[in-house]
Amino acid sequence: MANAPVSPVVLVILDGWGYRQEANANAIAAANTPNVDAFFATYPSTLIHTSGKRVGLPDGQMGNSEVGHLNLGAGRVVPQELVRISDAIEDGSFLRNDVLVKVCRETRQAGKKLHLIGLCSDGGVHSHLNHLLGLLDLAKVNGIADVHIHAITDGRDTNTTEGINYLQQIQAHIDKFGVGSISTISGRYFAMDRDRRWDRVKQAYDVMTQNGNLDQRSFAEILQSHYDNGVTDEFIPPVRLKEGAIEPGDGVIFYNFRPDRARQLSYALVDKNFQGFERELIPDLNFVTFTQYDANLPVQVAFAPQNLTKILGEVIADNGLKQFRTAETEKYPHVTYFFNGGLEVAFEGEDRELISSPQVATYDQKPEMSAKAVTDAACQAIEKGIYSLVVINYANPDMVGHTGKLEAAVQAIETVDHCLGRLVATIGKMGGTTLITADHGNAEYMADQNGKSWTAHTTNPVPFILIEGERRKVVGHGADVVLRENGCLADVAPTILDILGIDKPQEMTGQSLIAPAPYAVTRRR
């Protein structure tokens, strides 16, 4: 006799779908969303926190996709690398970090150059300006005179033309302490691609690893010229200001702490089997990354990864249940690597499907992205009737929100709403329960108070909607399930375990978002 189909719990992550009451510059409010509107009107919902200390970041710091998925999968507030590194600088232990001191000492003794690569902003998503300034202080203390900064401009996690101000702050620090020079500039569109668009990465790689062909203008003149022509920080074409190429035996510190957008350039610089584009390997680089970008990278890591145990994926596997993850390229690492606490490998019984993101320069050109294909993959997996947990990410609100184009963001929201209608119907047909939430805000705030396009994330809360399925009811509740207020992302994994009837491990400090029933009820799941 065949086993009955499994009725899953499906976690749907609407990346960048925040909540904001004001309708102005709000793509979500402006969009036609009949499905989400019906969900809010019909099913229990609440708002949860996705920023600041509630997700392991400094107070007031906006959340991001990496942090969001770490907290979602871990079931606890995970102290973030931004805080770890900033605290080390503040308490002085940064200057005693064994890996950082070692690369400085060996670079000085060999008479080589020290290169500092990273995103130059205070966005706090991939890097922080204070960390670069801390590295300049480290170089000064260790007597390194030849220090070259390969600046990556932001314009995505910050205002679009703030780059000139950040570089001026760096230059002021250089002038004050007498160490370092801004040798190259590359927009993050080139240096921090994560979708194997190697033609972009090659342009950044070339300016960092070659000499000659210098732009004689100051960095301020270069950036202002681009701003005047409508080119913002994210898209600044790679340019070389001073001689200072990365050469054999040099020391290199890549100070981004978030891995996903630092991997490709790192592989280009150190991987002997690299095939992204034609280049000769630069031998004997003394290469350090702030955090572990990839376990297979032949580099030293200054801040070793935290070991998270008994996370959601692991608990599901330990209970002999199968799970499925899917997203398109832009968010695939988030539902796999980050959701699994920084583990590259899948758990036993964890299946994955990667959907390719469209090959366009910016996603306002195709706001629907690959949402339909993601929905197809999710529905097919759900209909197999073998998965107890399904995790899906829709990238559209975040990726199109980052373009700052309101009309395109509205189209992105409407695309996702349409897909949700089909997805939730499929889950319902299988008797499953749907949890709809987001990892952080973005698309609900597309322009600042001055009307200038806003391309960064927000600190707004996000929705959490619970749609019970007939064969996956919440245990111990009657007809009405009540969701508590003031929750956070760390509470989602315990909620899933609550619905599945699995005991929460003590390592999970989050609490189920399902409020205790006011009276005892026995109910079939």
UniProtKB/Swiss-Prot annotation:
InterPro entries: Alkaline_phosphatase_core_sf, BPG-indep_PGM_N, Metalloenzyme, PGAM_B_sf, Pgm_bpd_ind
Keywords of this entry: Glycolysis, Isomerase, Manganese, Metal-binding
Transmembrane stretches, start-end: none
Residues annotated to bind Mn(2+) 1: 398, 402, 457
Single biological process term from Gene Ontology: glucose catabolic process
Recorded catalytic activity of this chain's protein: (2R)-2-phosphoglycerate = (2R)-3-phosphoglycerate
Broad EC category: isomerase
Pathway: Carbohydrate degradation; glycolysis; pyruvate from D-glyceraldehyde 3-phosphate: step 3/5
Free-text cofactor note: Binds 2 manganese ions per subunit.
Single GO MF annotation: phosphoglycerate mutase activity
EC number(s) given by UniProt: 5.4.2.12
Entry annotation: catalytic residues: 65 (phosphoserine intermediate)
Residues noted as binding substrate in the record, renumbered to the chain: 126, 156-157, 188, 194, 258-261, 331
Signal peptide start and end residues: none
Binding site for Mn(2+) 2: 15, 65, 439-440
Any one annotated GO CC term: cytosol
Cofactor: Mn(2+)
Domain of life according to the entry: Bacteria
Summary of subunit composition and partner proteins: Monomer.
Family designation: Belongs to the BPG-independent phosphoglycerate mutase family.
Free-text function comment from the UniProt entry: Catalyzes the interconversion of 2-phosphoglycerate and 3-phosphoglycerate.
Protein name: 2,3-bisphosphoglycerate-independent phosphoglycerate mutase
Organism of this sequence: Picosynechococcus sp. (strain ATCC 27264 / PCC 7002 / PR-6) (Agmenellum quadruplicatum)
Top-level taxonomy: Bacteria, Bacillati, Cyanobacteriota, Cyanophyceae, Oscillatoriophycideae
